[in-house]
Amino acid sequence: MSDITMYAAINSKVKAMQRKFLTKEQYKKIIECENYKEVLNFLNNETEYGKLLKGYDLQEIHRGQLEYILMKNYMQNFQKVIHFFNGEYKKFFKTMFMRFQLEDVRYILRGKYTGRQNNDLSSLVTYDSPLNDLNFEKMLATNNINEAIHALEGTNYYKYLKSITDKSDEETLFRIEVTLDFMYYSYLQKSIDKLNKKDKDIMNEIVGTYIDLLNLQFIYRGKKYYKLSPEEILNYTLTGGLNIKIDKLKKLCYSNDISKFQKVLLDTKYGKFVKYSVNEDYLVERDILSYISGMHLKNKKEHKSDISTVVAYLELALIEIKNITSLIEIKRYSINDEDLYKYLSFSID
């Protein structure tokens, strides 16, 4: 089967799904809303999201519940996308699904650390997916992080997490987080190798960029919040980055402070976009999402009969959810409309 034939149907479906994205004009109207409830009413009455909110009491929906509703819809759309593929391509997208599954694992483990009684499956976005193969009920029934990790015995997750110390603190959670990311990208890179050459090259570039940006986050957080040694931080960085190779990684890890870290970063492709020494953390996250968004929009425009359109849709849909939930959250506070623009991961003309 040619690439044109393979992608004709799925790209047509994806383009139809993309038309449901919010327009810049709709974003402007959300920003102009007076409060959280007004935003919900606008989403319900003036956008495609109204179909998702049907049947819910808008007066009772909080930010977390809205994010859950949006993510459950995303997972359904993800399943629709996978339906178009078979063989190694279906395996590839199933590996991508692991990214959301491990978020649910993280949610449970963090709950065990904080003492939150998160024993409700309805808080998890992947538990009822046909792609899910984890026993979340068993994890939720445990009393602490150590027991929850042992509840994963027999799964790929357990192989990576079993050596994590039973010490329950923020640093342990950080180690769990980076270990899960290492696991995910290890499996993802293996599945990419099974794609055809064109798609393999595209995905290696995309994933290599993600690894670069994730490594920057690891290094920054390890230095600022956990005071980890350069050796420890370097040990947790991921291999396979596109633009930041081992020599540059070492310089970043061994930089003495955030200012020197940023100076080394300026000598990379990302330095002028990601500014840790200047911006607050939420602005850095916004800039990273903006960079990712621009990459996918460019790929979608330049590549037609390949994997770019599908992956761009899946990633841009996630960014839209982040934009919506960010705006919803800050509508609780009295922030000028002009200031709200800086929370979005793209520019509004």
Where do the protein language model's features map onto the residues?
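N-terminal domain-start signal
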Residues: 1-349
